[in-house]
Design a protein with these regions (language model features):
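Amphipathic alpha-helical coiled-coil
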Residues: 1-414
């Protein structure tokens, strides 16, 4: 689906040609079947003994056969053309794959917080806008890389606007890992170890440094030793206790080189597993370094909330939802923004609560008709009415609503 979207925007000529070919081939195949059926019908209804004497029949069969061969040749040529079109389409597969990867980064975010839910329809529209806003280039390879980079940065910035501050680095790390996994840079077992720890029981064994290394850390080092890339780690640790203790005692263990050649043996991602084992407090710093190296500085500092950018993402059918934290009230900021947009006299708000649904629906209908902005506050206080609000939004027909209409919603986090 995303490949079709990318090609439709980047090479509409290919899209049109392929659609035309499909229709043409379908007609040709149907015509071929009709000719074959006609030839069989003529042969079945002709006396075999008079077959060679029926000049009209022979002429008809000859013409039908020639037409059939011509159609078959056209089909062969069409199939070759279709293969060439598909080859050209495949050049954009990398963009579509990145688009798919990005969507699956957010498909399970609701497990982190139920408020983090994103529809496929929203994402496809967003991805299309990213394509439209990517700087043009005459060189195809440059253009494709630009599409991948622009969509990734815009995706990160857009999603970060909808996340609580405490979840932003986690999301950047998830995005980084998904990209690395897609390019074969992360082993699945190593990823599981980093996220969940040892997956099977192993013998505890004697801790070589019980004075400063706790039993849990030693157990994880032994578990790491069972992974192919970490084979020999346990022995190295035992033989180089003093060097490893320097790492353990450092204020930020992620900034030091691991002893006994392990710094060279391991990738930056794999080093996080060692940090998890005996300096878990340094993992966030190590994650930040990985993100910086793999994705770039724009993924380290999450963008500050920008009401103007959020407004640009909205439409008559796409309301904006402010998820509130304790003490936060976006109403004043929105009022200032309305003034900046010369909408002060076209902006109204109301607080939802028991029995307010009918009034809110009426105000919404008026705002849609007049092209006003309506802010419905405290949606969490009208949970029973929200399904009706959802239906009202889904029923909005863009062509029948004033294009200046916007709906703003506020709610406390709710499961």
């Amino acid at each position: 689906q995303l490949l079709a979207l990318v090609v439709a925007k980047e090479r509409p000529d290919l899209d049109e040609e392929k659609s035309s070919l499909v229709i043409k081939n379908s007609k040709s195949k149907r015509r071929l079947l009709e000719i074959q059926a006609k030839m069989l019908g003529l042969l079945e209804n002709t006396d075999p003994n008079k077959l060679l004497d029926d000049l009209e029949l022979i002429k008809t069969l000859t013409e039908s056969n020639q037409t059939s061969q011509s159609i078959q040749q056209q089909l062969v040529e069409s199939e070759e053309t279709e293969r060439n079109i598909d080859e050209s389409r495949q050049k954009y597969r990398g963009v579509a794959c990145r688009g798919s990867l990005l969507f699956f980064c957010i498909s399970n975010l609701f497990q982190v917080d139920p408020m983090y839910q994103y529809s496929l329809a929203w994402y496809i529209n967003f991805f299309g806008i990213c394509i439209d806003n990517t700087p043009a280039s005459d060189d195809l390879e440059t253009r494709i890389q630009s599409l991948i980079d622009t969509s990734t940065v815009n995706f990160y910035n857009n999603i970060c606007r909808s996340l609580f501050e405490r979840h932003k680095q986690m999301f950047a790390f998830l995005l980084c890992c998904r990209i690395m996994q897609g390019e074969g840079e992360i082993d699945a077992r190593e990823y599981r170890f980093l996220i969940t720890g040892p997956s099977r029981l192993i013998e505890q064994g004697e801790n070589p440094a019980p004075q400063w290394l706790n039993s849990k850390s030693w157990y994880e080092i032994k578990a790491l030793n069972t992974l192919p890339s970490f084979d020999g780690l346990q022995e190295s640790f035992t033989k180089n206790i003093s060097e490893w203790k320097e790492i353990f005692d450092a204020s930020d263990a992620s900034k030091l080189q691991f002893p006994d050649g392990w710094d060279r043996k391991l990738t930056q991602f794999q080093k996080l597993l060692i940090l998890r084992a005996f300096r878990p407090d340094s993992v966030p710093s190590g994650i930040q370094d990985l993100i910086l190296k793999r994705l770039g500085p724009q993924f380290i500092e999450a963008p500050q909330f920008d009401l103007s950018s959020s407004f640009d993402d909205s439409s008559v059918t796409t309301p904006l939802l402010f998820v509130l934290s304790v003490g936060a009230d976006p109403a004043s900021d929105l009022a200032k923004f309305a003034e900046k947009k010369s909408f002060s006299k076209k902006f109204s708000s109301m607080s939802l609560g028991q029995g307010q649904g009918e009034i809110a629906a009426k105000k919404m209908a008026e705002a849609m008709d007049r092209g006003h902005w309506l802010m419905l506050q405290n949606c969490h206080l009208a949970v029973s009415w929200l399904p009706e609000l959802e239906v009202l939004i889904e029923k909005i027909k863009p062509d029948e609503v004033n294009r200046d209409f916007r709906l703003w919603l506020t709610s406390m986090p709710s499961p």
